[in-house]
Amino acid sequence: MNNNEWGLVTIPANIDPEQRAIARLKIASEMSLKNYGTPLVVTTSGGKDSSVCVEMAQRAGIPFEVQHNHTTADAPETVRFVRQEFARLENLGIKCTVNYPTYKGKRTSMWGLIPQKLIPPTRMVRYCCEVLKEHGGDGRFVCTGVRWGESARRAKMRGIFEKQVKDRDKSVKVHEDGGSLEELFAPCKLKAKHIVNPIVDWTTSQVWDFLRDSKVPVNPLYECGFDRVGCVGCPLAGKKRYREFNYWPAYEKLYICLLYTSDAADD
């Protein structure tokens, strides 16, 4: 692997997906240390893709931290799994941090946001993601488990390396391992959030094959038949959220209660 200071990222074309992901992480780590003076931040949601990224960072032999954004709407099993994983990683000397959401300068939650927004999250109005899931990371180089295979939108909108700014039209994405990093990491751009998605081109089958072969700990909800472990009742889950509400009825009651509260506030 050869990485020119502001030029092309060169990763051999004939390496396997695991080694390719590790190579991407090493490039991101080098850029993080060089430009920010801080280790790469590996984010974890408690899902399978995050588990792959944490394991890959360990195999890459790079310095890194792990951060989790506490959404307040995750399943209890997910919260416990993240705590257990953080305890395991901290025993290995890896710094782990839980970030709590804020809104207008104050701590908040999904259940605090809905009354302020006067509407629960919908497929078209997902204010919750920005506040609860995507906060943090400014001025740092961040690793996520985003994959193109998750949705057509992600296949179109996400890259291997990214520079994210508030005006998304001005964001920069590198979609190929031979892409230039010059625009991505120009000194004037360092206040943006920089992201590496090392397994962005992996399939779901590749993710599960890696986890099983490597015996990496995974969220126990997968063993219960769930294929996603995000926020309970997320509108993007479609009809699957009704199964989630059956499994965790307290969440459905909260949404319904706050929905009626919001309606009453409009009257």
Model regions: which residues?
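A short, hydrophobic C-terminal helix/tail in secreted or cell-surface proteins
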Residues: 263-267
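Nucleotide-activated chemistry modules centered on ATP-dependent adenylation/adenylyltransferase
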Residues: 1-262
